[in-house]
């Protein structure tokens, strides 16, 4: 802090206290509790004033300069905290823990928790239908000898969902995989090792936190995690052979412990997430398919926007996780599909969805209970959720059988009622509790005898005061007399100043107002002491009982977490069933054998956005027909056709029904898309460079089990360069990689490849022309397109007629010119064994580089020259 002096003696005692606390949190905003406000000082105040648009004032002086100060009301702090967290700031909450009445100096204060973007659990600070993750990464170039390697994996990554307790590690093999993971997780906060070699991988991420190298120590991480999970080794979690992932997990967990300053009982395990368990989606594919975010950064017109009709927030979050991590496990996928079928067949959608809506967000409520930050209404919501479970079980009974393959039975078993916990919460919490415990009125009557006695004494004050007022009116004859109370002066008897002349001698003046006088009697004073003492004891006891309630719920934590997971999964599968019926989806057949066969497939999003009937189209990719060259006019539907194929394949790999009349989907290992591009100005890359980078990633990483979508490869450069690149890419994918490929192009020359490569076929989207008007048919047909209709599309776009006319003239001239054949000789498979985007050196060049001409005789030099000439 630039404005604080090292010598604290010149400051007031309170400011010395503040500066001491601030020194522990130099990079964190301090919310310093003073009465009914949280105050910020010095640079914190200036920063908060700018970010929150609050007034910047001053308090006292230091070194002759006024101390900047800004503050927010205690009761409205959550709104300001939410804004700061959304902006990536961390805030330390410093509370008064001492009693102002007994404090000789400043009231004792301490930081009770640190709120960071990735560790928040408060309901008001979270988006309810979106995961909020904190991630830690380390690379294999760490100075730590146990982490430093020259081979894959290249990175260790761990992530934690504080609001659910999900703790996961993985080890990305390459920088591309790391970027894909970060895009999938979209962390609110990212911890990274100070030794990270390539900062450009994360520099555009928000919530960056640089951590010292020692926090990634492997031995410390293992010890820390064993202690948390109460184990002697981590073998049972399947992570003991993941040193980089464990190092990242250790750093992350220590950071969370330091910020939360409390036990973390809801973090009960760590899971290893392996890429080979799922369908790999790189960053470009996630973006191009618009899974949860559209190309403009919004949420509209995405796959999630169409599918997510979940009844609970936790179901919505799980659905999005499934979209970003499609699986290759046929057992899991068939379980999901069969459960969707059961829900439809048993007509469970209508009765189940209203019950699910009443369950709320059990997952995050349980997390807040584990962290000790749950509010009274969290307990009330949990109670309400538990009260719905018996009826939910009754509805599921029709789907329960003894068959071990009935996954619906498994879900039902994991969501059994919890009558004891339900009974505890019914007994302990009033029907409609207040927001906070501080004002009391949370614990239900009958829960604790001592509390009931104090409550009766406190509540009886009103009746006593009414009786006293009536007696005093009769005794004094002053009928305007009133008995009242306020927090400053306590109980009093109030009357007009005129009437006060005739008060009895036992009336003691307590306060004089402009028109009234206030008095107290010995009887009223004794009652005041008794009532205030009862109220104080009542509040203290109620807070104590409330804290004990946390401890009583904790033994059920594991079952509650299992319950929340089961309910979330049931919610997603019920949503899949509802969407299947509402949108006319079918159950795809998932098979091990490679291939994609789709009858009358439709685009999930586009068919919901268009007012016209969507034209359904087939897709057939087999071992004998691995690549489709797709031609046709702009706006003809090529990109839509390719995207809908990828989305149908992806939906099948999350266990969802698909928009088609029939579909058989073989398991794929990766989905790649190279569709559309724009300049990456932040990295200084042109559109063509972005296109080639994405293409290179596909050519290096696709396999014969991958689905590849390529749209207009080579369009960003000259015609011949672009055509040559497109041609070579198509040949490599067809002959060497042998991936299932949809290759859209305007280079009609590529259709000639079908005559050379037996596994390649041409399809096209046609259009009809009538009187210079064009009608797009949007129907996929076998064979190559007859023309591109580029001029007609330009005319539709409003290009001036004079330009269109001149273009037609020039087109006619070009078509009449003699164009030499560009069809090369058939290529052999082994031509791609050493394919690289770097130019290969000719053997002549290699020989010349390796030859020392000073050592050659004239005869040897002449022989070498003849030899080199023969190689040309």
Curated annotation (Swiss-Prot):
Domain of life the protein comes from: Bacteria
Record's keyword annotation contains NAD: no
GO molecular function, one term: ATP binding
Binding site for ATP: 632-639
Keyword tags: ATP-binding, DNA damage, DNA repair, DNA-binding, Nucleotide-binding
GO cellular component, one term: cytosol
Entry-linked PROSITE patterns: DNA_MISMATCH_REPAIR_2 (PS00486)
GO biological process: mismatch repair
Family: Belongs to the DNA mismatch repair MutS family.
Record function comment: This protein is involved in the repair of mismatches in DNA. It is possible that it carries out the mismatch recognition step. This protein has a weak ATPase activity.
Database matches in PANTHER family: DNA MISMATCH REPAIR PROTEIN MSH1, MITOCHONDRIAL (PTHR11361:SF34), DNA MISMATCH REPAIR PROTEIN MUTS FAMILY MEMBER (PTHR11361)
HAMAP family, A to Z: MutS
Name of the featured protein: DNA mismatch repair protein MutS
UniProt gene name: mutS
């Amino acid at each position: 802090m630039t404005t604080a002096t090292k010598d604290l003696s010149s400051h007031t005692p309170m400011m010395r206290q503040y500066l001491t606390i601030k020194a522990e949190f130099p990079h964190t905003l301090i919310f310093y509790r003073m009465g009914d406000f949280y105050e910020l000082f010095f640079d914190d105040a200036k920063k908060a004033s700018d970010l929150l648009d609050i007034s910047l004032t001053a308090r006292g002086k230091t070194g002759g300069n006024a101390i900047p100060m800004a503050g927010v009301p205690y009761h409205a702090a959550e709104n300001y905290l939410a804004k700061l967290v959304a902006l990536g700031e961390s805030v330390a909450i410093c509370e008064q823990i001492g009693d102002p009445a007994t404090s000789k100096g400043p009231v004792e204060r301490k930081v009770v928790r640190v709120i960071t973007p990735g560790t928040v659990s408060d309901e008001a600070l979270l988006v309810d239908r979106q995961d909020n993750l904190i991630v830690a990464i380390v690379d294999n170039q760490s100075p730590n000898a146990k982490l430093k390697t020259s081979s894959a994996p290249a990175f260790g990554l761990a992530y934690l969902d504080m609001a659910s307790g999900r703790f996961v590690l993985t080890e990305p093999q390459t920088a591309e995989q790391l970027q894909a993971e970060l895009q999938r997780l979209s962390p609110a906060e990212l911890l990274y090792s100070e030794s990270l070699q390539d900062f450009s991988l994360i520099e555009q991420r928000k919530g960056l936190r640089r951590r010292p190298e020692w926090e990634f120590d492997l031995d410390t991480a293992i010890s820390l995690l064993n202690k948390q999970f109460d184990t002697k080794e981590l073998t049972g979690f399947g992570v003991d052979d993941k040193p980089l992932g464990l190092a990242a997990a250790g750093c992350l967990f220590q950071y969370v412990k330091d910020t939360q300053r409390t036990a973390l009982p809801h973090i009960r395990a760590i899971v290893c997430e392996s890429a080979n368990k799922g369908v790999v989606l790189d960053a470009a594919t996630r973006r191009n398919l618009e899974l949860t975010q559209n190309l403009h950064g919004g949420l509209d017109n995405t796959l999630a926007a169409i599918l997510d009709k979940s009844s609970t927030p936790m179901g919505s979050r799980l659905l999005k996780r499934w979209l970003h991590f499609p699986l290759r496990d046929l057992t899991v996928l068939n379980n999901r599909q069969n459960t969707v079928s059961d829900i439809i067949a048993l007509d469970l959608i209508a009765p189940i969805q209203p019950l699910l809506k009443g369950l709320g967000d059990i997952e995050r409520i349980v997390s807040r209970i584990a962290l000790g930050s749950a509010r009274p209404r969290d307990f009330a919501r949990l109670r309400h959720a538990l009260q719905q479970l018996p009826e939910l079980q009754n509805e599921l009974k029709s789907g329960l059988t003894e068959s071990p393959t009935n996954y619906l039975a498994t879900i039902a078993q994991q969501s059994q009622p919890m009558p004891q916990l339900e009974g505890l919460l019914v007994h302990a919490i009033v029907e409609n509790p207040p927001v906070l415990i501080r004002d009391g009125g949370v614990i239900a009557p009958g829960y604790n005898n001592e509390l009931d006695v104090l409550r009766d004494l406190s509540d009886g004050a009103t009746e006593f005061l009414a009786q006293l007022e009536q007696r005093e009116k009769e005794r004094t004859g002053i009928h305007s007399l009133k008995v009242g109370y306020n927090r400053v002066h306590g109980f009093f008897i109030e009357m007009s100043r005129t009437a006060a002349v005739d008060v009895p001698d036992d009336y003691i003046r307590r306060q004089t107002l402009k028109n009234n006088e206030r008095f107290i009697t010995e009887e009223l004073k004794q009652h005041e002491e008794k009532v205030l003492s009862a109220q104080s004891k009542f509040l203290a006891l109620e807070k104590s009982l409330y804290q004990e309630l946390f401890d009583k719920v904790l033994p059920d934590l594991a079952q509650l977490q299992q319950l929340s997971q089961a309910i979330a999964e049931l919610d997603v599968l019920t949503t899949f069933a509802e969407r299947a019926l509402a949108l006319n989806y079918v159950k795809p057949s998932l098979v091990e054998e490679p291939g994609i066969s789709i009858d009358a497939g439709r685009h999930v999003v586009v068919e919901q956005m268009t007012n016209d009937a969507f034209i359904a189209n087939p897709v057939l990719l087999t071992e004998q027909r691995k690549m489709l060259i797709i031609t046709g006019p702009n706006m003809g539907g090529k990109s839509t056709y390719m995207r809908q194929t990828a989305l149908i394949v992806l939906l099948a790999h999350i266990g969802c029904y698909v928009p088609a009349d029939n579909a058989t989907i073989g398991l794929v290992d990766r989905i790649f898309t190279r569709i559309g591009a724009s300049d990456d100005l932040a990295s200084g890359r042109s559109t063509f460079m972005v296109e080639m980078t994405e293409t290179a990633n596909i050519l290096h990483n696709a396999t014969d089990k991958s689905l590849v979508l390529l749209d207009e490869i080579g369009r960003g450069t000259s015609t011949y360069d672009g055509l040559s690149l497109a041609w070579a890419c198509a040949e490599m994918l067809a002959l060497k990689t042998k991936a299932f490929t949809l290759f859209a192009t305007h280079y009609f020359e590529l259709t000639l490849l079908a005559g050379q490569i037996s596994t390649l076929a041409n399809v096209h989207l046609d259009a009809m022309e009538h009187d210079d008007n064009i009608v797009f048919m949007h129907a996929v047909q076998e064979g190559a397109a007859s023309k591109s209709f580029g001029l007609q599309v330009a005319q539709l776009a409003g290009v001036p007629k004079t330009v269109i006319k001149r273009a037609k003239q020039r087109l006619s001239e070009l078509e009449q010119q003699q164009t030499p054949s560009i069809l090369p000789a058939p290529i052999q498979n082994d031509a791609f064994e050493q394919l690289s985007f770097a130019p290969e050196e000719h053997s002549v060049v290699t020989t010349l580089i390796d030859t020392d001409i000073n050592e050659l005789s004239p005869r040897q030099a002449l022989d070498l020259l003849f030899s080199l000439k023969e190689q040309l």
